[in-house]
Amino acid sequence: MVECDYDPTEDATPAEVVEILGRTGMAGEVTQVKVRILEGPDKGRIITRNVKGPVREGDILLLRETEREARPIE
């Protein structure tokens, strides 16, 4: 077995889900949420992101980047 020193959470920024906006995707498999960035230069900023899988208010997500926002659901 090959060992790897890569840690996917190393570059991640924690963000707390503050509001669930709705479902999107062809079959509603993606949830659009507002998150508050908890660390880093964007700390305190609230952005909209799409999340795949179960999510609820208060959950902490680890974001690889905090620059990009999701387009609003129409």
Swiss-Prot record:
Pfam families cross-referenced by the UniProt entry: Ribosomal_S28e
Keyword Membrane: no
Record-level GO BP terms: maturation of SSU-rRNA; ribosomal small subunit assembly; translation
Any GO molecular function: structural constituent of ribosome
Keyword RNA-binding: no
Entry-linked NCBIfam families: PRK04007.1
Name listed for the protein in its UniProt record: Small ribosomal subunit protein eS28
Organism encoding this protein: Methanopyrus kandleri (strain AV19 / DSM 6324 / JCM 9639 / NBRC 100938)
